[in-house]
């Protein structure tokens, strides 16, 4: 892409903004200085990939990484909120049971399976790092 002065623009804003400016200036001043408002050949925005190298081996595509994040978020919510429903004081309310319901058992089984898979990945991680 050619700029207005006949010089080529960098492909990304990372190429255009010096590291010292990134560390010293505010986001507003960087925006005002480096982002064009007329839409003429703006540089692309970049996002840092913060995925550990071990996960790059296991999840090479962006889709696989997003699926992994989705599954781990679901697991975290299950671990947080899957406890039995009990009344705060006194005996169990009519809509709750003292024994685990079918849904609770299914969640517990899924949690155990997921923990087993994660343990295998951690074992693989130790082998790769070893």
Curated annotation (Swiss-Prot):
GO cellular component: host cell nucleus
Keywords: Host nucleus, Viral genome packaging, Viral release from host cell
GO biological process, alphabetically ordered: viral DNA genome packaging
One Pfam family cited in the UniProt record for this chain: Herpes_UL33
Keyword Calcium annotated: no
Predominant cellular place of this UniProt entry's protein: host cell
Keyword tRNA processing in annotation: no
Subcellular location(s) per record: Host nucleus
Function field: Component of the molecular motor that translocates viral genomic DNA in empty capsid during DNA packaging. Forms a tripartite terminase complex together with TRM1 and TRM3 in the host cytoplasm. Once the complex reaches the host nucleus, it interacts with the capsid portal vertex. This portal forms a ring in which genomic DNA is translocated into the capsid.
Family: Belongs to the herpesviridae TRM2 protein family.
Oligomeric form and interacting partners: Associates with TRM1 and TRM3 to form the tripartite terminase complex.
Protein name: Tripartite terminase subunit 2
Organism: Human herpesvirus 2 (strain HG52) (HHV-2)
Gene that specifies this protein: TRM2
């Amino acid at each position: 892409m050619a700029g207005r002065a006949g010089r080529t623009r960098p492909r990304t804003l990372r190429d255009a903004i010096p590291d010292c400016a990134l560390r010293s200036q505010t986001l507003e001043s960087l925006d005002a200085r480096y982002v064009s408002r007329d839409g003429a050949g703006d540089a692309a925005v970049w996002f840092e990939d913060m995925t550990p190298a071990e996960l790059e081996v296991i999840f090479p595509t962006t889709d696989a990484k997003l699926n992994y994040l989705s599954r781990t978020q679901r697991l975290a919510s299950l671990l947080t909120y899957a406890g039995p429903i009990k009344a705060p004081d006194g005996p169990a309310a009519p809509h709750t049971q003292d024994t685990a319901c079918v849904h609770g058992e299914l969640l517990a089984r899924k949690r155990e399976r997921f923990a087993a898979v994660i343990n295998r990945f951690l074992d693989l991680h130790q082998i790769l790092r070893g």
